[in-house]
Amino acid sequence: MTPAMFHVKQRDFGTPNGVWQGSNQGQARVKAARSGLMMLASGMMLAACSSPEEIAQDTAAAPPTATAAQPPAPPTPPAVDAAKVEFTDNAADGEAKREFAYGWPAEAAAIPALAARLTADRDKLLAEQKADWNGALKEFGNSDCIGCVNRDFSKTWEVVANLPRFLSLSYGFYAYTGGAHGNSASGGLVWDREADAAVEPRGFFTSAKAMQDVLGPRWCKALGKARRAKMGGEGPVDESTFPCPPIADLTVLLGSKGKTGFDRIGLIADPYVAGSYAEGDYEVTIPVTADIIAIVKPEYKAAFALAK
């Protein structure tokens, strides 16, 4: 499983400009250098045609150049005074094995209420796995079915965006409870430092219908392109078995490239949601535009920014 924009790792949603952004910056530097050389050459030519008295008079009359005003620096999130949490609990009974891992980043550990929430989730999942494993040992312990008695679970949270008020997190988990293969999935939440409470990413928007109306067409177009690329084809994708899933079936994550507000939205279709298990998951990044901000709840609009 690819760790969770957006799964368990901090997602870099990328940029719509891609490599062109760097190219534009390079062209700007070349133009600036050329402009500077032309100004220098012009100054030398003027100096050569002027007398020393004229040069001194012009220099004395020239007003001092005002220093260009610098834009204010964006606010910074609170400093982190905590350590990343990495918890494991493994056991073995003969050839039967049980493995469990759960972790969250230092930014989450620094918020007591959030750390308590994640700790409770970890303890609940561990207790469930232990009970399931013990039951499997009793039922299949004397059989040759190793897959029937092996259990594996991992869930890792990571930072998607860390803004002064909001900490956006994603998670990815993998679970094996017997059979041919395990299963993976993703999810996320946003922690509101002012309210000291969790907010579901969907909770920032006015309604599921509004999200579908605005994000749905962009998601389906990007998904079709991603499926064609993954399957190595150029023609249309057969959607008879796996039609484009609605936004309601996806993981929604809020990200920030500019660090001043949520300016991009990550959409993840877990395995089986938009394609076969072999296809894996699909991730799409939607830059925040004016029509997206229009469907954000009034109390959260200030937390969003247009993508640049």
Please annotate each region the language model reported:
Residues 10-11, 21:
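Cationic, low-complexity basic patches in intrinsically disordered or flexible, solvent-exposed regions
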Residues 14, 33, 37, 85-87, ...:
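Extended hydrophobic/Leu-rich segments
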Residues 18-39:
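Bacterial N-terminal signal peptides that target proteins for export
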Residues 46-48:
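C-terminal motif of bacterial Sec signal peptides marking the signal peptidase cleavage site
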Residues 50-308:
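Compositionally biased intrinsically disordered regions enriched in Thr/Gly
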